[in-house]
């Protein structure tokens, strides 16, 4: 039960970071923090119920998150090269 509370706290910290911060890299790190909190909850629930499904789901979420990191950082770097800023407000550059 303690791990589920910890996962909820970590998820809340990540959600607050996404809502409050304007820097794209910080927002990206907060989204990754939220994904890791979900992984912790999956593993904690799997441990409580004696199954392995939560661990398998957590593994697949980590694989997808690794691909997300590659694509997300490439987009952030392209915005930074164009504007010399990593602000979320500069993300509308990609529309043109």
Swiss-Prot record:
Its EC number is 7.1.1.-. One of its GO terms (cellular component) is plasma membrane. It is a multi-pass membrane protein. One of its GO terms (biological process) is ATP synthesis coupled electron transport. It catalyses: a quinone + NADH + 5 H(+)(in) = a quinol + NAD(+) + 4 H(+)(out). One of its GO terms (molecular function) is quinone binding. Keywords: Cell membrane, Membrane, NAD, Quinone, Translocase, Transmembrane, Transmembrane helix, Transport. The chain crosses the membrane at residues 1-21, 25-45, 56-76. It is found in: Cell membrane. It comes from the Bacteria. Belongs to the complex I subunit 4L family. NDH-1 shuttles electrons from NADH, via FMN and iron-sulfur (Fe-S) centers, to quinones in the respiratory chain. The immediate electron acceptor for the enzyme in this species is believed to be a menaquinone. Couples the redox reaction to proton translocation (for every two electrons transferred, four hydrogen ions are translocated across the cytoplasmic membrane), and thus conserves the redox energy in a proton gradient. NDH-1 is composed of 14 different subunits. Subunits NuoA, H, J, K, L, M, N constitute the membrane sector of the complex. This is NADH-quinone oxidoreductase subunit K. It comes from Thermobifida fusca (strain YX).
């Amino acid at each position: 039960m303690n791990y589920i509370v910890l996962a909820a706290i970590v998820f809340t910290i990540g959600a607050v970071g996404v809502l409050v911060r304007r820097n794209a890299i910080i927002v990206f790190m907060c989204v990754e923090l939220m994904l890791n909190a979900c992984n912790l909850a999956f593993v904690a629930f799997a441990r409580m119920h004696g199954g392995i499904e939560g661990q398998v789901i957590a593994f697949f979420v980590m694989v997808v998150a690794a691909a997300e990191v590659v694509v997300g950082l490439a987009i952030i770097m392209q915005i930074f090269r164009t504007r010399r800023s990593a602000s979320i407000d500069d993300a509308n550059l990609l529309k043109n």
